[in-house]
């Protein structure tokens, strides 16, 4: 029991350290894409910049709006970072925290709970900008979870279950990225929207909503939202690697190296998209999901069901 707690604690600490360096990589990559250097003052090559930013935020005085609900105001960022870390329990890592038979269902359940942290933060701030940003974030997140859920069902038809280890075994010969490329493209775009990344970062919308649902947060509470957002980005890309790009189960070291390299490649694509595309209009964002992704995903799902019935191959664990 104690060893499990220590293992979980160390895993969460490593995730937060990875998130810290992810922010540095983002600033560096965007800097070079815009023909500038990025952070290069604090430490060698700017490697200590994330820690300097974290210390700066956490030593700031915590301020709350005078009419805010203090309990919910503090609960919202704590809930956000807690859910972002709990999601990692389901991943089939070399030193996995648990062995889940319904890992994908667990991910859907926990990610849907993150909506409450967004809505609570906007409502507890007692600010119209924060509330409007929270409502946008909730509508966007719920909308894209519909297609993400249907894509997961389409993938489980091939794997035969919701256990993530089944996907690793399934992709020993060929990645699902190739036969399922339409679903992969929609999945990648949906993860951009699910994590509120550009060009779907309408929840922040500086030109319209000042800063979105976290406009009233500062110091350590804002840092918790920031850590939760980047932990979710890291997790969604890791999940994409497991679902579509497979990994070898030859050894733990090879698995870790392979998964890290593929995850970093997907994160680079996230940053490339951010540097290349302007923000969508909100109605375009909703039309993309409800009028494009949803019908296509349903059609592919029905096609896969019909093919499995036609050839008499029915997954045993669905």
From Swiss-Prot:
Main location: mitochondrion
Gene Ontology biological-process entries: aerobic respiration
Subcellular location: Mitochondrion inner membrane
InterPro entries the record matches: NADH_UbQ_OxRdtase_su1/FPO, NADH_UbQ_OxRdtase_su1_CS
Classification via PROSITE patterns: COMPLEX1_ND1_1, COMPLEX1_ND1_2
Membrane topology: Multi-pass membrane protein
Alphabetic keyword roster: Electron transport, Membrane, Mitochondrion, Mitochondrion inner membrane, NAD, Respiratory chain, Translocase, Transmembrane, Transmembrane helix, Transport, Ubiquinone
Reaction catalysed by this enzyme: a ubiquinone + NADH + 5 H(+)(in) = a ubiquinol + NAD(+) + 4 H(+)(out)
Assigned GO CC terms: mitochondrial inner membrane
Record carries keyword DNA repair: no
UniProt GO MF annotations: NADH dehydrogenase (ubiquinone) activity
The keyword Transmembrane helix is assigned to this record: yes
Ranges annotated as spanning the membrane: 5-25, 69-89, 102-122, 148-168, 174-194, 215-235, 253-273, 293-313
EC number, UniProt record: 7.1.1.2
The protein's enzyme class: translocase
Family: Belongs to the complex I subunit 1 family.
Stated role: Core subunit of the mitochondrial membrane respiratory chain NADH dehydrogenase (Complex I) that is believed to belong to the minimal assembly required for catalysis. Complex I functions in the transfer of electrons from NADH to the respiratory chain. The immediate electron acceptor for the enzyme is believed to be ubiquinone.
Designated name of the protein: NADH-ubiquinone oxidoreductase chain 1
Source organism (scientific name): Myxine glutinosa (Atlantic hagfish)
């Amino acid at each position: 029991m104690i060893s499990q707690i220590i293992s979980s604690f160390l895993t969460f600490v490593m995730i937060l350290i990875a998130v810290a360096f992810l922010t540095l990589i983002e600033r560096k990559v965007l800097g070079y894409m815009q023909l500038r250097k990025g952070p290069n003052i604090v430490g060698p090559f700017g490697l200590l910049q994330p820690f300097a930013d974290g210390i700066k935020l956490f030593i700031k005085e915590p301020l709350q709006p005078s009419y805010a609900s203090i309990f919910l105001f503090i609960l919202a960022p704590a809930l956000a970072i807690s859910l972002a870390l709990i999601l990692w329990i389901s991943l089939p890592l070399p030193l996995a925290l648990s062995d889940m038979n319904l890992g994908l269902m667990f991910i859907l359940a926990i990610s849907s709970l993150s909506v409450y942290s967004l809505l609570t933060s906007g409502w507890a701030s007692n600010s119209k900008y924060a509330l409007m940003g929270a409502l946008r974030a909730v509508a966007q997140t719920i909308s894209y979870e519909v297609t993400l859920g249907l894509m997961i069902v389409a993938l489980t038809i091939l794997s035969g279950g919701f256990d993530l280890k089944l996907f690793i075994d399934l992709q020993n010969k060929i990645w699902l990225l190739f036969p399922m490329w339409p679903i992969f493209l929609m999945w990648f775009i949906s993860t951009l929207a699910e994590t509120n990344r550009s060009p779907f970062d309408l929840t922040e919308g500086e030109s319209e909503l000042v800063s979105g649902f976290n406009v009233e947060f500062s110091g350590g509470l804002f840092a918790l939202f920031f850590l939760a957002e980047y932990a979710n980005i890291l997790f969604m890309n890791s999940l994409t690697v497991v679902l579509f790009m497979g990994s070898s189960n030859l050894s733990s070291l090879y698995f870790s190296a392979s998964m890290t390299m593929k995850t970093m490649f997907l994160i680079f694509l996230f940053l490339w998209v951010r540097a290349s595309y302007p923000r969508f209009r909100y109605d375009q964002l909703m039309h993309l999901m409800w009028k494009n992704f949803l019908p296509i995903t349903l059609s592919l799902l029905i096609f896969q069901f019909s093919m499995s019935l036609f050839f008499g191959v029915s997954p045993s664990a669905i």
